[in-house]
UniProtKB/Swiss-Prot annotation:
GO terms for molecular function: DNA-directed RNA polymerase activity. It comes from Staphylococcus aureus (strain bovine RF122 / ET3-1). The lineage of its organism: Bacteria, Bacillati, Bacillota, Bacilli, Bacillales. This is Probable DNA-directed RNA polymerase subunit delta. The gene is rpoE. GO terms for cellular component: DNA-directed RNA polymerase complex. Belongs to the RpoE family.
Length: 176
């Protein structure tokens, strides 16, 4: 059955990934992702909001389903259309080539190398602003000196002691 013969009910019931396979098989050529989605919208008479969640799932399925191949520029085709050599060529990462610098290039003052930061941009930023505190604040040392550790008393709550004793007694009951 051709994709154009689908009814709205069939479009509602069928997954977008299966419809995309049928559509690409019918057309026999690669299609842009957005054109595929527009085709589905027209078939099912959908608004964008109505199929938004289905489109998200469709894109995930399109990337994971082995029947499809992204041939670049958001163009999708069927993997069956391509030989193994074609697939490797289409999906192989491209390597960006750089020129090797010679002695003359290294002396060029106007040449900017990759990874070099422009130091001039940071000249107007002060090392410390007025609203920042210094790490070695003398007031902090004064506070530490004012605390006498021998004056600190830790009071134990009697209720907590009673509960601990009860827990200990309960454990002895289990051993007996």
């Amino acid at each position: 059955m051709k994709i154009q013969d689908y009814t709205k009910q069939m479009v509602d019931e069928k997954s977008f990934i299966d419809m995309a396979y049928t559509l690409l098989n019918d057309k026999g050529e690669t299609m842009n992702l957005y054109d595929i989605i527009d085709e589905f919208r027209a078939l099912g008479d959908y608004e964008y909001e109505e199929i938004e969640t289905r489109v998200v799932q469709f894109y995930t399925d399109l990337n994971t389903d082995g029947r499809f191949l992204n041939v670049g520029e958001n163009l999708w085709g069927l993997r069956d259309w391509y030989s193994v050599d074609d697939i490797e060529e289409k999906i192989a990462p491209t390597i960006q080539k750089f020129d090797v610098l010679d002695a003359d290039d290294e002396e060029d003052q106007n040449l900017k190398l990759l990874g070099e930061d422009e130091m001039d941009d940071d000249d107007d930023i002060p090392a410390q602003t007025d609203d920042q505190e210094e790490l070695n604040d003398p007031e902090d040392e004064q506070v530490e000196e004012e605390i006498n550790h021998s004056d600190i008393v830790i009071e134990e709550d009697e209720d907590e002691l009673d509960e601990d004793e009860e827990d200990f007694e309960d454990e002895e009951d289990f051993k007996a």
